[in-house]
Regions:
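Catalytic micro-motifs at enzyme active sites that drive phosphoryl/nucleotidyl and oxygen chemistry
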Residues: 137-141, 169-172
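Glycine-rich N-terminal segment of FAD-binding domains in flavoprotein oxidoreductases
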Residues: 22-119, 131-137, 227
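Short, flexible, solvent-exposed loop/turn segments with mixed acidic/basic and small polar residues
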Residues: 15-23, 79-85, 186-194
């Protein structure tokens, strides 16, 4: 472990961290920059003191990749602002630490959303890009990479690199777990939705044949789905499941749905 006696910049301090499920505990020098210049300063400090540094978003990954015991972490969660929003082009440019749920809250009332919506809505944009995550609507929209229009990458030497989908490094950065550099910002393509509300249907399946048949229908009739499988079922009950399927509600239905939601005590 590197010495903790060497004074780092004011936005860097040694902290204990745990993995998402609490199974791993580490101690790292955590930098929480609010500007690109502070990101550069953190990288420079690590170069000067022979330390490795790992980018960290919201810490919501199950793979526990954003832990760097005894070394440095660049926590991008404070860089979470909307840089630009082009409603006509349906594109939004955000900083790396912007959470997906904050994007939804910013655009849903404008009848827009992210085409590929990961299951973990509290993940950061950069984390979703680095892991190229997918969600319950992957069969329609693929993984998160498909909606990335362009991004800005901070290299280890402090230089920045603008990368769009035609750039030779694009496919290496997306899904690259941050190994090529630090994502500073990204422009994402949004898609129109009929309303900000969804209808969720709960569909039981008594066995694997029923599961496959139901999912074939759900793929045509719904926008997203998740299956909860009873792993202990055996014999004729193998594959026993519950399917949660969702579809966007058409605009004409939203007012009655809104009244039902408010009557149930939700906002």
């Amino acid at each position: 472990m590197k010495s903790e006696n060497q004074t780092p910049p004011s936005f860097m301090e040694w902290q204990e961290l745990t993995s998402l499920v609490g199974s791993i505990r580490t101690r790292s020098l955590v930098a929480r920059p609010t500007t690109v210049e502070q990101c550069r300063e953190a990288l420079a400090y690590c170069r000067q003191h022979d330390m490795t540094i790992c980018a960290r978003g919201a810490g919501r990954g199950y793979g526990e990749l954003a832990l760097n015991n005894g070394q440095a972490l660049l926590d991008m969660s404070a860089m979470n602002r909307i840089i630009a929003f082009d409603e006509e082009a349906a594109q939004i440019t955000v900083e790396a630490g912007m959470r997906l749920i904050d994007i939804y809250q910013a655009v849903h009332h404008r009848l827009l959303t992210l085409p590929a919506s990961p299951t973990e809505s509290h993940s950061s944009v950069a984390g979703a890009i680095c892991a190229n995550v997918n969600g319950k609507d992957a069969w329609h929209h693929g993984s998160f990479a498909r909606q990335v229009v362009r991004l800005t990458l901070l290299l280890a030497d402090g230089e920045t690199l603008a990368i769009d989908r035609s750039h030779e490094l694009f496919k290496a950065v997306v899904g690259g777990i941050g190994l090529l550099g630090i994502i500073l910002e990204a422009t994402l393509q949004l898609k129109p939705i009929p309303s900000p509300f969804v209808e969720i249907n709960r569909l039981p399946a008594p066995d694997v044949d029923a599961l496959l048949a139901t999912m074939a229908q759900v793929e045509k009739s719904h926008d997203a789905a998740v299956v909860w499988v009873d792993a202990y079922a055996r014999g004729r009950k193998t594959g026993r499941s519950v399917i949660h399927a969702a579809r966007w509600i058409e605009r004409d239905d939203t007012e009655s749905q809104r009244r039902e939601i408010l009557a149930a005590g939700y906002e």
